[in-house]
């Protein structure tokens, strides 16, 4: 995964720089998000690595799929997507498209001063609790916060909140682990 992110970074940065210059940041995000979903599809992935298909056939398949999923963004970026796909095909790097999407999203979040935070829970939180968590995180980090909700029954209760390197473990599992460590002394 780390290698894929390293390989993906220059591609994401190049697309981001182009998106900034041409005021097409959101269009590129939509395209990369769609490509990520396409590449994660097992049938599509099989076709991409199948030597029976030529590079041209693979490129046509991917372009047709992206055009179906994201017609507006594809229309805006048609020639750029075509060039981008050809570059990835030539370099045998199509399978890192999900990683390119991830790095691109991180670049866009940083540019827009947005922090992604994950809230891991056992029991679903109501809208009021989500809003309280979001407001507290926005106050703490002085930035807009996007919450990602993750269900994990192994926590037993409570929540774990992660934002970048910052972690707040308010789970029962975490409390029991800390108690056990303290008792061991």
UniProtKB/Swiss-Prot annotation:
Signal peptide: none annotated. It is a peripheral membrane protein. Transmembrane segments: none annotated. It comes from the Bacteria. GO terms for cellular component: plasma membrane; proton-transporting ATP synthase complex. Pfam families: OSCP. The keyword Nucleus does not apply. Coiled coil: none annotated. F(1)F(0) ATP synthase produces ATP from ADP in the presence of a proton or sodium gradient. F-type ATPases consist of two structural domains, F(1) containing the extramembraneous catalytic core and F(0) containing the membrane proton channel, linked together by a central stalk and a peripheral stalk. During catalysis, ATP synthesis in the catalytic domain of F(1) is coupled via a rotary mechanism of the central stalk subunits to proton translocation. HAMAP family: ATP_synth_delta_bact. PANTHER family: ATP SYNTHASE DELTA CHAIN (PTHR11910). F-type ATPases have 2 components, F(1) - the catalytic core - and F(0) - the membrane proton channel. F(1) has five subunits: alpha(3), beta(3), gamma(1), delta(1), epsilon(1). F(0) has three main subunits: a(1), b(2) and c(10-14). The alpha and beta chains form an alternating ring which encloses part of the gamma chain. F(1) is attached to F(0) by a central stalk formed by the gamma and epsilon chains, while a peripheral stalk is formed by the delta and b chains. Belongs to the ATPase delta chain family. This is ATP synthase subunit delta. It comes from Coxiella burnetii (strain Dugway 5J108-111). The gene is atpH.
């Amino acid at each position: 995964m780390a290698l894929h992110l390293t390989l993906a970074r220059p591609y994401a940065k190049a697309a981001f720089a182009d998106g900034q210059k041409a005021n097409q940041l959101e269009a590129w995000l939509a395209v990369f998000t769609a490509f990520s979903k396409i590449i994660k599809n097992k049938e599509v992935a099989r076709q991409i690595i199948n030597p029976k298909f030529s590079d041209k056939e693979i490129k046509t398949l991917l372009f047709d799929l992206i055009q179906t999923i994201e017609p507006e963004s594809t229309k805006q970026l048609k020639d750029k997507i075509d060039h981008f796909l050809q570059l990835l095909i030539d370099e045998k790097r199509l399978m890192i498209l999900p990683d390119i999407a991830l790095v691109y999203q991180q670049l866009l979040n940083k540019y827009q001063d947005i922090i992604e935070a994950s809230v891991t829970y056992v029991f679903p939180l109501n809208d009021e609790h989500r809003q309280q968590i979001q407001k507290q995180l926005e106050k703490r980090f002085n930035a807009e916060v996007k919450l990602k909700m993750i269900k994990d029954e192994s926590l037993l209760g409570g929540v774990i909140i992660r934002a970048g390197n910052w972690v707040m473990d308010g789970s029962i599992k975490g409390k029991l682990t800390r108690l056990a460590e303290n008792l061991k002394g």
